[in-house]
Amino acid sequence: MIQMQTNLDVADNSGARRVMCIKVLGGAKRRYAGVGDKIVVSVKEAIPRGRVKKGDVLQAIVVRTSQGIKRKDGSVIRFDKNAAVIVNKQSEPIGTRIFGPVPRELRAKNHMKIISLAPEVL
């Protein structure tokens, strides 16, 4: 569950390391974002010579949450940290690689490019 002011790790090679959620997209009074939801983020920490720099305001897709995801069979998938992938306006990843596992629920939200780049789909 991601809300405003939540800090997230970046799970791609766009150049950002840490971002902070400044808005949850998808409704006027929407408060929380889960896996597969689009958020607006501000870059808080970036590497030198990356595609993005500190202070940039971008869109991102949440790929991992520490709260977890409940599945139909009753199982719950939790991750150690919250993570997101930086995307452009067409929801395509800016980076060319994705680090760490991503959940299968991204497929239902039509983020196929993220799933194809991920090393492991849980």
Swiss-Prot record:
GO biological process, one term: translation
GO molecular function: large ribosomal subunit rRNA binding; structural constituent of ribosome
Transmembrane stretches, start-end: none
A Pfam family reported for this protein in Swiss-Prot or TrEMBL: Ribosomal_L14
Key words of the record: Ribonucleoprotein, Ribosomal protein, RNA-binding, rRNA-binding
Signal peptide: none
The keyword NAD belongs to this UniProt entry's keyword annotation: no
Domain of life: Bacteria
The keyword Ribosomal protein appears for this protein: yes
Gene Ontology CC entries for this record: cytosolic large ribosomal subunit
Cited SUPFAM superfamilies: Ribosomal protein L14 (SSF50193)
InterPro entries from the UniProt entry: Ribosomal_uL14, Ribosomal_uL14_bac-type, Ribosomal_uL14_CS, Ribosomal_uL14_sf
Family: Belongs to the universal ribosomal protein uL14 family.
Function: Binds to 23S rRNA. Forms part of two intersubunit bridges in the 70S ribosome.
Subunit structure, as described in the record: Part of the 50S ribosomal subunit. Forms a cluster with proteins L3 and L19. In the 70S ribosome, L14 and L19 interact and together make contacts with the 16S rRNA in bridges B5 and B8.
Official protein name in the record: Large ribosomal subunit protein uL14
Species for this entry: Phenylobacterium zucineum (strain HLK1)
Phylogenetic lineage: Bacteria, Pseudomonadati, Pseudomonadota, Alphaproteobacteria, Caulobacterales
